[in-house]
Every structure is written in structure tokens, then in C-alpha cells.
Amino acid sequence: MTKDNQEKQRQEELRQEELRLAPLRIKIDEVDRQLIELLSRRAGLALEVGHVKQEFGSAVFRPERERQILEKIAQINPGPLKNNGLQAIWLEIMSACRAIEEQLTVAYLGPAGTFSEDATLQFFGHSIELMDCHSLDDVFRSVQAGRATYGVVPIENSSEGAISRTLDLLLDTNLIISGEISIPIEHALLSVSTDLSQVKQVLAHAQALAQCQEWLNVHAPHLQRQAVSSNAQAAKLASVDPELA
């Protein structure tokens, strides 16, 4: 087959593909239109719910109610979407509807890119105002002062147990725990240097250093260990210095 014939055959295949896809895309567009109408109706009902909550002085965010909805979504899901995918979609729907009732500001231990930010978005969805704080104390102060509606802080991990500073702050303030989320955490030793022997110091949050101490003792005993405010800050510092990881 000549090159010209191959090109003609390919063009014909593309034409046939487009003929089959076109009606399916029209159907998808119609389903999208219906979804938008239904989501708008849901948002309108959420506004009505918000008015009732405001009348009775109730909180807009009810994590137990949202958890019930996500559980119900999994129960009535006929497929082919997997439950975790459908629940992720519904989390964002609820987050967007909640935002038109009241815009929540959520403080977390920053900067951006920390596990705390990840937990915040997994719990509240993306339709919130994020407030990154330099310390756990700042998170608590932001909520107490009314600058943030909620705060997200680490309270325990499976390898090192409870985070003592978080527990102290819970005892010293009148703030209460209103919800919880567990997220998997994996650490990696990263550096711009391609030779580990050239790296002199490893930076990380104190909890991360404690969690990784056995691995570091075996694989990188020569590295000095320095605690910093967050793993995200450690990554930022290491990204510009080949002697850091």
C-alpha cells in the first residue's frame, strides 16, 4: 500500500469514527444540560436549607449530614461509576452548594502542598477559602479570632501517636472537634542532587523525621536532621540547594 493510500485509509477511518461519535456526543451534551438543571435545582434547595439554618442559628456545615449523603450515594449507585469516584463528585457538589449558603474559610497548617491542605480539601471540597498558617497555634488563633470558620490540624498518626501540641491547644482553648478524616501518608527523600553522598542535611517536619528515623538510620545515617515548620517548606528549601534533601 502506497503512502497516499495509507493516508486515504486513515482519513476514511477518522470519518467513520466521527460519524459514530457524533450522535453519542449529542446525547452527552443533552445529559450535561439536564445535569446542570438538576444541580441548579439542588443549589436552590441548599439555599432554602441555609435560610432555615440561619433562622434557627444552626451551623451551615454539618459533617454528619454530609457523611450520611455520601454513604447513601454508595448504597444507591447502580454503576458503572465506582463508589469512590461518585462520592468525590458529590463531595464537590455539596461543597459548591454549601458555598452559596455561606463561604467557609478554613485554616490549616501551611504552606500549600502540606498533608494538612490535602486533608482539608478531601474533607471540605474545593469551594472554600483556604488560610495557610505558620503553626498549629496560628490555626487555633485564627479560628478563635473569627478569621477562619474552621481549622484543620493533625491530631495523631499511626507511627508516632498523638500530636502533643494539638492536644495541648485543645485543652487550652474552648474549640471542639467537629469532624475527622484519615489520609494515607507516604514520605520520599527528595533532592536536586543526583548523588546522595553530596547531600549533607535532611529537612522535614519533626513528625516526619520521627516517622522516618529508622529508614534514615539505615540508608542515610550521614545526614544531619533539621526540623522545619512543614514538609512543604522543607521541599522549597531543598529545591534550591543540592546539599539539602
Report each predicted region and the residues it spans.
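Domain-level signature for soluble enzymes in the chorismate/prephenate branch of the shikimate pathway
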Residues: 1-245
